[in-house]
Amino acid sequence: SGFVLKGYTKTSQ
């Protein structure tokens, strides 16, 4: 999944 934190996007597998 992915989410946005502090203005950047992070993807998690």
Curated annotation (Swiss-Prot):
Tissue specificity statement from the Swiss-Prot or TrEMBL entry: Plasma serum.
Keywords, sorted A to Z: Antibiotic, Antimicrobial, Secreted
GO cellular component: extracellular region
UniProt KW Phosphoprotein keyword: no
Stretches assigned to coiled coil: none
Main localization (coarse): secreted
Subcellular location as annotated: Secreted
GO biological process: defense response to bacterium
Function in brief: Antibacterial activity against Gram-negative bacteria.
Name under which the protein is recorded: Salmocidin-2A
